[in-house]
């Protein structure tokens, strides 16, 4: 049997981080078994479903590197098929028309509330003849759920989960306007798509019991089910925006790499021994739904930062350069950088990446650490950098300006000899000259090594920047 999984999001917003992990698990299991992953858009809620959300979901999957087989399937466009199966269930005696009025249903709920039990439909139309139907009321179709015993969901993650049938009642599968309920549409679609494995969040477990009843009523094979634990925040509570419940597009804009996000998400609820960093091929080779944990996973942004930093350091410089430019329009200050990004600065930025990526955990940090390349003269020094250019710092800076101006050639060897000659003459340590020099060249107290910065900026720009600070500080 060829494995077919499916990712079935509702297009009511972005591809959130929990959905991305569900898609990843489905994709990995399909790849692990040599099967397929299909994409179904569950767009039956016409008021909340939008084309923009569909696009965001597909874009998010593509960015994550999670390809699906075939074309996306619209659940809404299959409404006629859902209706046909509901009618077939009635014909087979597995479902029935219910003409209970809204007033009757409200009365049932009120009675249940008064008796201290959950509201349940009382089955009053289950065995009544269709000829007794009242005038002017459009019926719904309800499934004939088992009245006693229990429905068992055989789950690869949760084990056997048992549901007393008395708690499930005769739920609606087709509304009075002819539209299918989610519960019914999902079963019909999974069957028609040939889905063999359903991998989704464990908040769908109760749905699984009701869907099992529909599968059995139709005499269809029930897919293997694996209900994975939800992702919680660092505080153990339900994941909120404050604790990471953002869309994949937000993580992209925050400067995370798709490979790093995949690596982080795969370990939320699944692991392979103590392996923390793993290649995509390793994930495909090792992943199995049998190894998914039952307990909720906690989202740890610091851990994601650490993993992303690793992938930054391991990435090709050109790829990082391209990825950084790609997110610039969506980052704070990115528009200004784009306006200043002439060919010379593009070359400087690319050359700086080997040094910048060693101290950057995200692309945004990489861009921020490269800000000295994009800034305009005269540089605005941050507070710490200003403190370095005190009287002693200015004296050193003035001496360095004269020494560098006289440097015979602007290469690493000549610049290093010039700086070390000054250090020996003045009996100083390298750090004591590097700090004021870095402040003047970058406006910051952290940057690549000062020799690297001097080479990146070139002779003219370096000397102009140093002189700017000497002119500024003289006037203080």
Swiss-Prot record:
Example of a GO cellular component annotation carried by this entry: cytosol
Q: Which Gene3D superfamilies match?
A: 1.10.10.350, HUPs
Give the CDD domains listed for this entry.
GluRS_core (cd00808)
**GO function term, MF aspect, one:** tRNA binding
SUPFAM superfamilies named in the record:
An anticodon-binding domain of class I aminoacyl-tRNA synthetases, Nucleotidylyl transferase
Provide the residue positions that the database annotates as binding ATP.
241
List the InterPro entries hit by this protein, alphabetically.
aa-tRNA-synth_I_cd-bd, aa-tRNA-synth_I_codon-bd_sub2, aa-tRNA-synth_I_CS, aa_tRNA-synth_I_cd-bd_sf, Glu-tRNA-ligase_bac/mito, Glu/Gln-tRNA-synth, Glu/Gln-tRNA-synth_Ib_cat-dom, GluQ/Sye
Which GO annotations describe the biological process of this protein? glutamyl-tRNA aminoacylation
Record keywords, A-Z: Aminoacyl-tRNA synthetase, ATP-binding, Cytoplasm, Ligase, Nucleotide-binding, Protein biosynthesis
Query: At which positions is motif 'KMSKS' region?
Result: 238-242
PROSITE patterns on file:
AA_TRNA_LIGASE_I
Reactions catalysed:
tRNA(Glu) + L-glutamate + ATP = L-glutamyl-tRNA(Glu) + AMP + diphosphate
Motif 'HIGH' region per UniProt: ranges? 9-19
Localization? Cytoplasm
What is the main EC category here? ligase
EC no. given is 6.1.1.17
Tell me the PANTHER family matching this sequence: GLUTAMATE--TRNA LIGASE (PTHR43311), GLUTAMATE--TRNA LIGASE, MITOCHONDRIAL-RELATED (PTHR43311:SF2)
Q: What job does this protein perform?
A: Catalyzes the attachment of glutamate to tRNA(Glu) in a two-step reaction: glutamate is first activated by ATP to form Glu-AMP and then transferred to the acceptor end of tRNA(Glu).
Q: How does it assemble?
A: Monomer.
Record's protein name: Glutamate--tRNA ligase 1
Protein's gene: gltX1
